[in-house]
């Protein structure tokens, strides 16, 4: 009987959710990571034994090892587990084991999947949840319920979504991201999305996506440009809300700001309609409080709003900045300052022009060094692409303000940080 499960790279947002879920299911969980983080500290408080850094002895007496995508073959724990003949599964390979007895509601897509799955989790409040973001109403990326139903954020970046065996599948969009995993062939990525949808009994898709609009099998289709009407935004006590009408179902109000919020919520509503009546959905939508690092307001007063956002692709940044412009207009703020920590050299190099375009509407742009995420550096002339940007080595939080390494102080207007790397910590760490 497999009882003792060890996670290598347990501090990752996706893998920590799996560890939490299996612990609730009754397994004895341990894990390790390179360095301590907020997640590893929380796991320890929850009773998980976490070892820092990796050491081969950490896997002694384990029945199964699950490792994150960041783990290389030369990792001492991975190597030793192989030598000892302990079964080792990648996160992707472990999914069938984790999801085996569940009715899975899986959400995939290049953008909006965390938001869509977390809104769906608020609507289907009897379901367990495993997502790659922290749900603010629960303070965790995992919710365990004694239920057959499970809302799961499915990842296309490593094709692991094909192991999620969805009962219901939502695809928000099929824009080409993570193409390196698919041999840089868009057709392979699209084929994977088709496979993912084909398995499901119920399918909900954004039918205005260039690829999804040609999907042949039966599905519930959202045509955003005609199905979503009267989309308006408002601020209540500095909190952002978006109201919209969906098809002939009446008005809905969701926490967050921007048309993309209405789109994500609409997909979740159309999925939930298979299980709930419309008034229950309308009411439960009000429970949704957003997710950490998605238009996440860290400080707000009449003069200054400081926001942390995970956006690291031009499409996401553009959508979020359009929401920021709306917030500034409604709140009467002076200007928008964007602080950008590029994530991965390959993504930056591939989308340079699009990034430049995405930031066109801001009053000030501050650019931090690239967060490499283990990649080799690529020589790029960023100063030529962003001629008006201020390039700084670092930025830190002092009280409610931000101070750059060159001494500049950012203290008014709407300041928004973008990135999937370290920027979140920089924006949150107050130097008392």
UniProtKB/Swiss-Prot annotation:
PANTHER family per the UniProt record, alphabetical: UDP-N-ACETYLMURAMATE--L-ALANINE LIGASE (PTHR43445:SF3), UDP-N-ACETYLMURAMATE--L-ALANINE LIGASE-RELATED (PTHR43445)
Source species of the chain: Campylobacter jejuni subsp. jejuni serotype O:2 (strain ATCC 700819 / NCTC 11168)
Protein encoded by which gene: murC
Gene3D superfamilies: Mur ligase, C-terminal domain (3.90.190.20), Mur-like, catalytic domain (3.40.1190.10), NAD(P)-binding Rossmann-like Domain (3.40.50.720)
A GO molecular-function annotation: ATP binding
Reactions catalysed according to its record: UDP-N-acetyl-alpha-D-muramate + L-alanine + ATP = UDP-N-acetyl-alpha-D-muramoyl-L-alanine + ADP + phosphate + H(+)
Protein name in UniProt: UDP-N-acetylmuramate--L-alanine ligase
Residues reported in the UniProt entry to bind ATP: 109-115
Subcellular location: Cytoplasm
